[in-house]
Regions:
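Acidic (Asp/Glu-rich) sequence patches and key acidic residues
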Residues: 1-121, 125-138
Length: 138
């Protein structure tokens, strides 16, 4: 089942729920020292739980910008597939594109786009439309 970001009547495709969970798990373990939502409460708390309200989008975008900057400091091998079970690895292992140079560009959606860019675009669209952004299944 496909998961993505819903903004009003717009859909921003991500991929599988496991893949999106990996993105948030990587943030938790690598940038929040295993304390989910402690550093990035809007992204990790509110959005991950399903919805980031319109009034919190500016703060969410600031957090996302910091996440991208911080993830540049980690190699692709530092990816976390599941914060609850650190023994799990991505199904593709280390077989990744040479275009992926660090964790800031590791996460690519099922339609080939950079996940952080897609999320930023969705959040900006939500700001423009004055609505919330939700994680939803297609």
């Amino acid at each position: 089942m496909a998961v993505g970001f819903k903004v009003g009547y717009y859909w921003f495709q991500v991929g599988t729920s496991d893949f999106l969970h990996s993105f948030f798990s990587t943030i938790c373990i690598r940038l929040e020292h295993g304390k989910w939502g402690r550093v990035y409460p809007k992204l990790m708390g509110e959005l991950y739980q399903g919805c980031l309200k319109n009034q919190d989008l500016n703060e969410g975008l600031e957090e996302l910008h910091k996440v991208r900057k911080e993830l540049k400091n980690f190699s692709p091998s530092d990816v976390i597939w599941d914060a609850e079970d650190l023994s799990l690895t991505p199904p593709w292992g280390n077989n990744i594109s040479s275009d992926i140079t660090d964790l800031s560009n590791y996460f690519v959606t099922s339609d080939g786009r950079d996940l952080i860019s897609v999320l930023s675009e969705a959040m900006n669209e939500a700001k423009e439309m004055q609505c919330d952004i939700e994680i939803d299944n297609l």
